[in-house]
Amino acid sequence: MKPDRDALDEYFEYDAEEFLVSLALLITEGRTPECSVKGRAESFHCPPAQSRFPGTARHECSDKLAQCRQARRTRSEVTLLWKNNLPIMVEVMLLPDCCYSDEGPSTEGADLNDPAIKQDALLLERWILEPVPRQNGDRFIEEKALLLAVRSFVFFSQLSAWLSVSHGAIPRNILYRISAADVDLQWSFSQTPTEHVFPVPNVSHNVALKVSVQSLPRQAHYPVLTCSIHTNIGLYEKRIQEQELRACQHHGPGEVEYRCPSSSQSLCSKHTWTMAPVSALHVRSGMPPEYTAAIRNVRLCPGTGSKSDQGAPQASVLGFSGTGGEVRSQEASVRTFKSLPVVDSSVSSCQSSRQPVGEPNPLMDSLIQDRQEVIARIAQHLIHCDPSSSRMSELPFNTQESTSLSPKLHPVSQESGCVRRYKEAFSVSFGSPEFGSPGDSREGKVREKSETRPGETCTSHSLYPRQPAGEANPLIGSLLQERQDVIARIAQHLEHIDPAAHIPRPAFSKHDSNSIPSKVFRSSFDDKTLLKKGRENVSVSVSHTEVSLLGDRGDGESLKPSKCLRSFKYSPQEKPLKPEVRTQHQNHPDSITPTARQELLNKAAGLLTSSNTALCKESSLGLVSRLESTSCKLQLKEQEMSHETEKQCLHCNSIDKQICTNTCTEKINDEHSPGSLRHLQCDDSKGIDSKLKVTLLEMPDSLNKNKTNCSSKDSKRSKTCEQSIRVGTENDLSEENEGPGSTVSDRLKTEQEAKRDSGAGKPHSVKHCLSAGERLHSADMLRTTLKHSSVWRKHNFHSLDGTSTRAFHPQTGLPLLSSPVPQRKTQSGCFDLDASLLHLRSLSSKSSRPCLNIDEDPDVHEKPFLSSSAPPITSLSLLGNFEESVLNYRLDPLGIVDGFTAEVGASGTFCPTHLTLPVEVSFYSVSDDNAPSPYMGVITLESLGKRGYRVPPSGTIQVTLFNPNKTVVKMFVVVYDLRGMPANHQTFLRQRTFSVPVKQEMKRSINKENVQHTAQLLRYLIHLRFQSSKSGKIYLHRDVRLLFSRKSMEVDSGAAYELKSYTESPTNPQFSPRC
């Protein structure tokens, strides 16, 4: 039978705003990319798909987390639009990987209003959340059903499929835009979208929610998005390639060197003037900011590309004479722009030849895409993570500086006919014959020497310039120093802030492992390993700007000599770049073979001067000395740690009342501590156990000579512990109050006995001492008599109401905390009342009944004996004092039992989700004769939120209690009806379950009423708290408290019984206002 819709009109499982925010967060954060097999995950802010498992903590937002800040903004935007009765639009878009970082533009800034983003973005989905009038009729769904439907759509969306296939790698630049659903604000789809409309649920008294989504049709392949800037760069690059190709066909190799750059210089100058704004260039250029600053200065130069505008600063800075160096520097600047969108620095030598125009190469496209992703990541982190690097743009930077550095980062791959031309260009741009490769032709070397002035030292643009004293340019020195600092910051940011930069990618070629992230941006290992490698490869220190040359040139042998010969140039500016140098040693340990290294050393011997050799020796000696000092420091630290742990162990072995568990594991040192293998493990017994367990590990054969001494020492310690701690309960407690003075005499006596035992040479003295202590302790326990519970109040067992608990059983001496279920003497199975508790002031009765006089009343011997301060006879079955005291935490528990769980559910006009929650179970001591202790369980509902667990206004609540073995202890079923409960009120229900004998023989009619009450034995109890919200919704809040017996359904043998349940609630008043 379908429930009446009108009866459900006032009750909704979610608030309208809360439900709307849950939908928006599910759309925006339900497929957060992550590096896993699934590729995506729901964030902590999304509504849970299932009930929370036991132990799962509720997420607490923090302002330090960007995702939490974004979720807060989403919540505020959705709430604002909903309060203004405006439809909400959520758009899901993709941005190109080349120009946008992993984080992408945020919705809080003005980036979304940029027309470039609107032009570059690919719209995937458009969600419309629109309030509509309340739906009437039989066809309706609940809010939870709509939430499940939206979750299913998000799970099977196109974006989720891409993330799943790529394991979270692509797409990374996902943009969500939340705004009002206005036609003027909507962005257009690239194709005709498909629309899906979800069923409409009612979310409030007069409003329903209509959710629809328009999505792009399924794509066969992942779209390759390109931005407008890189599209323009590609156009210029294509025209430059065509002109150079024609020049190479019509002119000889010698003429190409001079005519190709000059013919394309005007195009390059035009390109620099027509680039994007400075901010876009800084993000999208794909180069670190020091190189970006150089290009930015090129763009801002007033010159139009003529040789006279650029030649003067080149000649003044580099010291070149003639036009050869000038023309080659212009050629290098052209190559910089040309190599940006085309060539990847990770392309191997066999793939570095140019593809014919018009023939697409998918491998090259994938490599270009990978290169652009790395470039975008570098630029983004330099903007958002290192704002200080942006100041580089304000400094003057010469154009030739960029032309000499750019070929290092972005080497150009040309066809085999132009290889010699590029080798000569590299050697000339470096400005020193030392940088030439062994494969250079003789003509190139003669040209280099003729262009360099004799007796004049040319300034190099590598990272280690060498200038004579007095000729150094302070401007260039400061720029080089800042560039080195920026590169060091790049490596730190990409390692510590952007772990996604190290996602493993499929190898495209055998040299793909030499890509930019693996070559430059890797963090160093520990200093010890680095110093060892630095000592072995002192002569092979690679500068960070030359790493990208690996795998890009066709002649592999020409790379290694140039790489090594450059490393011998030393300057004081080398010091801040040691982390990068070490990093490259680690990432490329096989880049220089021993044979190649020997050849390079032989080659270097003829080229280096004596000063360079002395500097290299000094650097190698410095590395060796640092390695030796580091190793000495490590040894000293290890020795200090071993001595400290040994002192801690000896301190723990000493006899005092603060006995702790020794977890120190000593490092064995054969010379200093041969006997450090002994461990003494003591269990914490300060209020838990009255006996001390001493565990001795066997001694190894190599330490037999110390066996007797160690055993005697251990016997002293163990016997002292046993004599001073394992005594009667009263003595133990009084000993704590009196102080350590009483233990000194015992310690002296036990030491004398231990000396006699050790002098006899018995290796089993420890066991003998332990056994003697146990016999003495058992004899003392047998002589101990039962004490009244009020005696325990003398020994520092403080409680909230004065009723104290015992830590040790008075007869057996066993600790009650280590035995959660004490043994009992009676087999009745009921909660026997401890008569001694009735004498305590906290449990005294306030009844006006007169006290019983034994002498005057002749029938008193036939009635159950009662104390003069006992409560009324109607509460003898623990329905009064014990029940209220335990439920209100007025009794201290003896112990806690872990592992209990409970499944909470409800049914009525709707069925909320069943929850499985942990139960905190504790037990108590109710008598001196070891009667069975009842258990109290508390189910905390605070993890569900401030309101609690939503239940129907009337129906049943079912609570199933499971023990640690996952078997059912009790199933509580409580029927309730709170339809008359007003808003913002609270009440409670308490259900008691008694075991009642079926047949009773009343021997004495005078005690008939009394016997009926005493025969009803309380077996189970459940206490439920209810409250109503402002809208009239009913919640089970705060906690659920249970009382249950230790043994399930165990009563007197042979007695027939039945269980009867009674549910009670307040009557006057039935409901009270919420606090």
From Swiss-Prot:
The keyword Mitochondrion does not apply. Residues 440-454, 746-759 have a biased composition (Basic and acidic residues). It holds the Pfam family Chromosome_seg. InterPro entries: Atos-like_C (IPR033473), Atos-like_cons_dom (IPR025261), ATOS_Transcription_Regulators (IPR051506). It is found in: Nucleus. Belongs to the ATOS family. The protein contains 2 transactivation domains (TAD). Each of these domains may be required for transcriptional activation of a subset of target genes. This is Atos homolog protein A.
